Structure formats: C-alpha cells, structure tokens
Design a protein with these regions (language model features):
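Single conserved hydrophobic/aromatic residue that forms the stacking wall/gate
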Residues: 1-8, 12
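Short, conserved glycine- and acidic-residue-centered signature motifs
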Residues: 4, 33, 74, 154, ...
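Hydrophobic face of alpha-helices
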Residues: 5, 34-37, 79-82, 174, ...
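P-loop NTPase catalytic phosphate-binding loop
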Residues: 9, 51, 100-105, 109, ...
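Helix N-cap / beta->alpha transition motif
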Residues: 13-16, 152
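Non-catalytic, charged/low-complexity accessory segments that flank nucleotide-binding cores
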Residues: 16-134
Length: 243
C-alpha cells in the first residue's frame, strides 16, 4: 500500500450525523422501579442484611440499585445472595458491584424487562460528542446511567476486541469505523482493513478513507502489516530528525 493524498479531499464533505439511525425512546416505569426496590429491600431484610436503598440508576439495558450497609454488616452477606436475588425478582441474571468503585456502597444491577435499543446516532449526536474536537474520538455506546461513552483512539495505540459469539464484536468495530468516517476527512485518516472471512468489512470498499481495498488474502495482509511497520519506523525517524 502507498499513502496518497486524495485530490477529492479538497471538496470532501463529511456526512451528517443525522444519517445514523437513533434508538427509540423508552423510559423505565417508575412504578416498576419502586416495586423492584421494595422486593429487593424485603429480601435483604428476610436474610438479616441491614441495609438502606440510597439510589436507583435506570439505564438502557439494566438498572442499578445502590445500597449502603449498616455498620458491622459484611459485604459477603450480600454477595452470597446473588442467586436468591435473581430467583426472587424472576430475572435470569444479577450482577453485583461490591463495592461500587470509589464509594462505600454496593450496586445490584438487574436487567430491564424492556431494553432500549442503543444506536450509534444516539452517541454521536449527543452534547458530549459535539464538545469533543479530536477527530479520533469514537462512539462506543451508553453507560448504565444512559450517558454517552466515547473513546479517544490516540490514547489507545493497541486495542483488542474480544468476546464470545453474539457478544457484539462486529457491532463495536463498525461503530468505531463509522465514527471515524463521520468525524474525519480522508486526508486526516487512512485505514487498512483485513477481512479474511470476506463477510465483515466489504461494505467499506468504496469509502475514500481506505488506503487500499479491503484485504481478504492472507499473504496481502502480511504485506500490509509489513508496510505499516515500515511506515511507523519512517515516521519515528522523521520525528527523531526533527528534535
């Protein structure tokens, strides 16, 4: 591959965020939250756990119920009840944060009965995203409190995306790539994509941000990586000469 400045980049117009689909608005029922909080408090009392429910944080897929233990109550008394909590609330899974990082509280995360579909458009059109000026800020999703989460790739030179089948690896990669296409010009960012399965990245073949067509041949993939290493070393040399 050879890095070439595109003549079309002088007139390149970034695509608007409005092209991206946004998720449907779905608010969690306050009555349902109150009922779940009551059931949770009752269960803790039945098991002799003295605790106070201090906050409820509804998110797009799960709701976190935050409790503070009475003096002398061990955290293990709550963590040992995860299966009992799931059974009592008729939910397949419960996640415990014991404690919530940086706080003297325990978080009990329970899946919502109705989950909100989070789309990339929700993230990139948010006020948090529009305030960010660095072109390598990419959208990941919404956190448990429904706040947009973005990541600056310049601060993460090495990223490994892993997970079991259906965990959302491809969706994550597509969100990163789409964020770059929306937020950058072709002369600012060039990408090399390798897709040995030939089914994941073919839709990006015609975008101007690609340095070369999506690579599907393993040998060409090795050649592309070798070029990338050589280009990296060349830039290091330029930086060293400029010091």
């Amino acid at each position: 591959p050879r890095l070439v400045s595109s003549a079309a980049s002088d007139v390149y117009k970034r695509q608007p965020v409005s092209l991206l689909k946004q998720g449907s608005s779905l608010s969690t029922s306050k009555k349902l939250l109150q009922e779940t909080a009551k059931d949770l408090t009752q269960l803790l009392n039945e098991h002799g756990v003295e605790a106070e429910l201090t906050n409820v944080v509804p998110g797009p897929t799960v709701t976190r119920y935050e409790i503070e233990l009475a003096p002398g109550v061990k955290v293990s008394k709550v963590t040992s009840l995860s299966h009992d909590i799931a059974y009592a609330l008729a939910t397949p899974d419960v996640r415990l944060l014991a404690p919530i990082p940086g706080r003297s509280a325990i978080g009990i995360e329970i899946p919502n009965r109705q989950r909100k579909l989070v789309s990339l458009g929700d993230v990139l059109s948010s006020s948090e995203a529009t305030k960010l000026t660095h072109p390598l800020n990419v959208g990941l999703g919404l956190d448990i409190a429904g706040k947009p989460r973005l990541l600056n790739l310049s601060e993460l030179p090495h990223v490994l995306i892993a997970g079991q089948t259906g965990a959302g690896k491809s969706s994550c990669i597509n969100s990163i790539v789409t964020s770059l296409l929306i937020r950058t010009n072709p002369d600012d960012v060039k990408m090399v994509m390798v897709d040995p399965k030939r089914v994941e990245l073919g839709q990006y073949n015609d975008v101007p941000h690609l340095l070369t067509k999506v690579i599907t041949n393993p040998k060409k993939a090795v050649d592309a990586l070798s070029w990338a290493v050589a280009e990296m070393d060349r830039r290091y040399d330029l930086l060293a000469d400029g010091q």
